[in-house]
Amino acid sequence: PYGLWYDEVTASNLVKVNLDGDVIGESEWGINPAGYVIHSAIHEVVEDAQCVIHIHTTAGMALSCLAEGLRTETIYDAVIDGEVAYHDFEGVTLFEAEKPKLVASLGSKKMMILRNHGLLTVGRSIPEAFMFMWRLNRACEIQIAAHGASSNVLPVSDSAIAASKAAYDGLRDGDRHAEKVFNALLRKIDRIDPSYR
């Protein structure tokens, strides 16, 4: 809902739109044109993109400004090593001409760092896209914190990356792992403040 601050957005006031940007149903709010370009670019082309998440966290934006990108220095990085795409900043994302470039940059990956901009993830479900985003943002947070504390940060070895990926693949349990974590977080939100609904 364009015009609401982030803490005012609830599940019930989200604005539904079609791929042409037309609002479906009733809403007193419009949509963010830049958000529409980014989300619709992926939804139009990526067949299994049931959910696209795009955020501007401090850590994600800070890391998106670093030429080196995401380094493999923690367990979070090890699990997603080689699975993060990058898209160069072209200015505020308001133009249809950027849509095919976004899709080309993403390729077959599910996570993308929009350089000088933020983070994006794609999932076959809301829980899957959220899980990818949580891991990607967490990796950014830790890299920014570690490099702020010291220039002597240890990289993760190739064998540890391979072992981490193998262990994670064994835990995936199809989509159920992401669903379990997502549902646990929903229960937590319900306990704290159910007004998000």
Cite the ranges covered by each PLM segment.
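Glycine-rich flexible loops
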Residues: 1-197
